[in-house]
Curated annotation (Swiss-Prot):
GO terms for molecular function: translation release factor activity, codon specific. InterPro entries: PCRF, Pep_chain_release_fac_I, Pep_chain_release_fac_I_sf, PrfB. The modification N5-methylglutamine is found at Q249. Pfam families: PCRF (PF03462), RF-1 (PF00472). Belongs to the prokaryotic/mitochondrial release factor family. This is Peptide chain release factor 2.
Length: 367
């Protein structure tokens, strides 16, 4: 027999789903899809690769949304049929419970796809980490964060490239940059930008005192080569240095690593992942271009502080999330109030509950 609680949940899910459908109007989406597919069948459109790429992305997004709608509609049809049959066969109630769980998962995915609507959300993401004041303890915390994000990306099926790693004197890192490659990598990671705080008994303190450490995370989207960002030669300073090792990896014997400073903004990027100085310079310029592009967008939106997360003070009061090991274990996001006591799981990359809550918190539903 279907329980009262299950019936209430079904009604709530149906109402939630219908509210989302009203936002996008599937009939209008189908008409828009046919129009764009007609445009793409014209050979002339492919002469402008940038425009063709934008249309292709839009087509893929609409198809994903319509596919989700069809799947959720089938879920509700199965539930309705199951409810009728359960009056004669009480055993069907268990099957309905499973379908309800499935439709709940599908609606959540549908909701996230509606939220990830910025044109840049689909892009790869550059993620940089910088420790705050505190020496070895904060350097170690920064490396813990680097591992956390790399593990999260691996769990999501993304590809991770370590572009730059500057080790700390005793442990951890002074700075690091990774490229997370995969669909919607930037969309998922963009709200991770900010200051992250750790409270623990420091393994580097002989007196075993409790320490508070900070590290900042900055995230910018990788941008297409055909997007024009002017970088004047006189506005940059290029330095070369010997690549630093990370666990015995990524070490070159020559001064192949490159650091580029953009003088007007103070933005500094470096790259040492490639074998040649020329390759590292090209990649560093690409990262700089992405940061300057995002900076320009931020100025237009009057949100410079939000985009330039790494330039904010890395200290108390600016943190977006706290990771506490002493006197209790807790990871808490200060924007969404999402929290968990499973510190080890979070540091091993289980970030989805935080990232999904962020997306809902900052949601701007549009197509």
């Amino acid at each position: 027999m279907i329980t009262y609680e299950t019936r209430v949940k079904i009604d709530e899910l149906r109402e939630k789903y219908l509210n989302f459908v009203k936002l996008i109007d599937p009939d209008k989406l189908n008409m828009e899809l046919k129009k764009m597919e007609s445009e793409m069948s014209d050979p002339e459109i492919w002469k402008d690769q940038r425009k063709a790429g934008e249309i292709s992305k839009k087509v893929r997004r609409i198809k994903e949304l319509l596919s989700d709608i069809s799947e959720i509609e089938r879920n509700f049809e199965d539930i309705d049929v199951g409810i009728e049959l359960s009056e004669e066969d009480p055993g069907i109630a268990q099957d309905i419970e499973k379908i309800v769980q499935e439709v709940e998962k599908n609606i959540r995915r549908f909701q996230l796809e509606l939220i990830l609507n910025d044109p840049l959300d689909q892009n790869n993401a550059y993620l940089s980490i910088h420790p705050g004041a505190g020496g070895t303890e904060s350097h170690d915390w920064a490396q813990m964060l680097l591992r956390m994000y790399m593990r999260w990306a691996e769990r999501k099926g993304f590809i991770v490239e370590l572009l730059d790693f500057q080790p700390g004197e005793e442990a951890g890192l002074k700075s690091a940059t990774i490229l997370v490659k995969g669909e919607y990598a930037y969309g998922y990671l963009k709200h991770e930008r900010g200051v992250h705080r750790l409270v623990r008994i420091s393994p580097f303190d002989a007196a075993k005192r409790r320490h508070t450490s900070f590290a900042s995370v900055n995230v910018v989207p990788e941008i297409s080569d055909d997007i024009d960002v002017e970088i004047k030669p006189e506005d940059i300073r290029i330095d070369t240095f010997r690549a630093s090792g990370h666990g015995g990896q990524y070490v070159n014997r020559t001064d192949s690593a490159v650091r580029i400073t953009h003088l007007p903004t103070g933005i500094v990027v470096s790259c040492q992942s490639e074998r040649s100085q020329h390759q590292n310079k090209a990649l560093a310029m690409k990262v700089l271009k992405a940061k300057l592009y995002q900076l320009e967008l931020a100025k237009r939106r009057e949100q410079l502080d939000e985009i330039q997360g790494e330039l904010k003070e890395i200290s108390w009061g600016n943190q977006i999330r706290s990771y506490i090991l002493q006197p209790y274990t807790l990871v808490k996001d200060h924007r969404t109030d999402i929290e968990t006591g499973n510190f080890d799981a979070v540091l091993d990359g289980e970030l989805d509950q935080f990232i999904e809550a962020e997306l809902l918190y900052f949601a701007d539903y549009k197509i």
